[in-house]
Swiss-Prot record:
The gene is rnc. InterPro entries: dsRBD_dom, RNase_III, RNase_III_dom, RNase_III_sf. This is Ribonuclease 3. The keyword Hydrolase applies. The keyword Nucleotide-binding does not apply. Coiled coil: none annotated. It comes from Shewanella piezotolerans (strain WP3 / JCM 13877). Mg(2+) binds at residues 42, 115, 118.
Length: 225
């Protein structure tokens, strides 16, 4: 099996340099490609992600109920959210998949991408320690943690629209500026334009809707600073 290419670029994207690169290789290896795959690392990363996000929400929302905290955590650690992070990292470019998964477009499949993010978290923990892992996860989630609210768990597009309406501002304009890949495996690049920002904000995802949500989340972060 060929080595994974462009590892230095991926490490720069992640914000972490592995001392033991074999851990990263394993985290990127799907069970269809090798017996030494990423499922055990995924198990570990899932637990670490849960405690890091739980701790962040507990301190960020001191008056939130247990139910509110649970719903916010579920939103942040769900497969859809993890897959969005994977797409932002272009993680599909680095995955090791078996021939069948490659042929069926597994490098774009939400579940495979989400599992790989959790596996990378597990690999970083084993390569360093829990505090280093915590800082990285919080950095990856910074924009999402800034815009999440205890009530209703509205999506970023809805939250952005309500925020702009509150201040009597024009609604955002979303525009697809680029698509890439075959019809069933496309990546969408969407621009979001709002009055208060000098330039458009770009979101990239596996669907137009997800790309719009990603762009809206970034806009919310910028205008609430």
């Amino acid at each position: 099996m060929e080595p994974i290419k462009n590892i230095p670029r991926l490490c720069r994207t992640l914000g972490y340099e592995f001392a033991e690169q074999a851990l990263l290789d394993q985290a990127l290896t799907h069970r269809s490609a090798s017996n030494k795959h990423n499922e055990r690392l995924e198990f570990l990363g899932d637990s670490i992600l849960s405690i890091v996000i739980s701790d962040a929400l507990y301190h960020q929302f001191p008056k939130a109920t247990e139910g509110d905290l649970s719903r916010m955590r579920a939103t942040l650690v769900c497969g859809k959210m993890l897959a969005e992070i994977a797409i932002e990292f272009k993680l599909g470019d680095y995955l090791k998949l078996g021939p069948g998964e490659l042929k069926s477009g597994g490098f774009r499949r939400e579940s495979i991408l989400a599992d790989a993010v959790e596996a990378i978290i597990g690999a970083i923990y084993l390569d360093s320690d829990i505090e280093k892992c915590r800082k990285l996860v919080l950095n990856w989630y910074a924009s999402r943690l800034r815009v999440i609210e205890p009530i209703n768990q509205k999506d970023p597009k809805t939250l952005l629209q309500e925020h702009l309406q509150k201040f009597r501002k024009p609604l955002p304009i979303y525009k697809v500026v680029h698509t890439e890949g075959d019809a069933h495996e496309q990546t969408f690049t969407v621009e979001c334009v709002v009055e208060d920002l000098r330039q458009a904000v770009v979101g990239v995802a596996s669907s137009r809707r997800k790309a719009e949500q990603s762009a809206a989340a970034q806009v919310l972060e910028l205008i609430k600073k």
